[in-house]
Curated annotation (Swiss-Prot):
Tissues in which the protein is found: Expressed in perinatal myocytes (at protein level). Expressed during postnatal development in skeletal muscle and heart.
Name used for this protein in its record: Protein ATP1B4
Any Gene Ontology CC annotation: chromatin
Role description: May act as a transcriptional coregulator during muscle development through its interaction with SNW1. Has lost its ancestral function as a Na,K-ATPase beta-subunit.
Protein's organism: Rattus norvegicus (Rat)
Gene designation per UniProt: Atp1b4
Amino acid sequence: MRRQLRSRRAPAFPYGYRYRLDDQDEMNHNYLADEEEEAEEEAQVMMVPGLEEEEEEEEGKEEEEEREEEEGQGQSTGNAWWRKLQIVNEYLWDPEKRMSLARTGQSRSLILVIYFFFYASLAAVITLFIYMLFLAISPYMPTFTEQVKPPGVMIRPFAHSLNFNFNVSEPETWQRYVISLNGFLQGYNDSLQEEMNIDCPPGQYFIQDGDEDEDKKACQFKRSFLKNCSGLEDPTFGYSTGQPCILLKMNRIVGFRPEFGDPVKVSCKVQKGDENDIRSINYYPESASFDLRYYPYYGKLTHVNYTSPLVAMHFTDVVKNQEVPVQCQLKGKGIVNDVINDRFVGRIIFTLNIET
């Protein structure tokens, strides 16, 4: 701020005193010297820019900036998207720094090399563990068989929901069952069995010693063993006369042998209702059992030509024009056929509805 000069007056002398003239002259001389000194100081102060002028300049600059901002607001809306596009373009490719997506080619190459060695090491470790696992596991014989369930069963021909519903006088209703049985029994043709397999003595296990990777021989199960249900004598398997044939087989279990040398037998009856609804069933083979010569099974890698034995049920006298629930069970030592929550362990349930 500007300094203000203080005004000075000649000192007033008290009334009644008298001073000498030389003293008065000296005081006046000093007064004039002080006035000159203060005038010089004021001149020096006036030469320095004042604070008020600086403030005025700053206010002027602020007003100019505000005007520029107001003028730029109209253009900023139109240029906003253009600036964003420029930013995106520079992010995708910056020609000055030669960077794409904020990375140089060298950094990307380094990242690829790191990931390559990382995943290569990971794959090598996994491959090593899998290799060690396969060394410990035999491909020919299961390592753990304690939890293997007793054999389940399945039937042919295939029927939706296990309901055999057909009309004797309408071939189109039962022809699909005949086709299914013919296709299933192709592998049991006598000529094919005689060519691939050997004739084994019945009533005893066919145990084959040797290395576990050695090919095993299989016993013959000819289609002709099924007699009236073979499709050789009656190509319709009894469906044209209302006496259908249904084939049953046990699922394969590696190393399974019926206990105590007793063959597993098959027995069918009415599940619920009048037992007289099924008055006659013929079984083929006549023993209604799976002969011991077809056991044990050594697995698909070595027992290549193995043919599962079958038991055919020929329902020769069944009540007509109503549904008959049928249950067929396996019976033998060590066979389980009463599991409530599994309908196919040791038994199977299906329905016959033969219309005339």
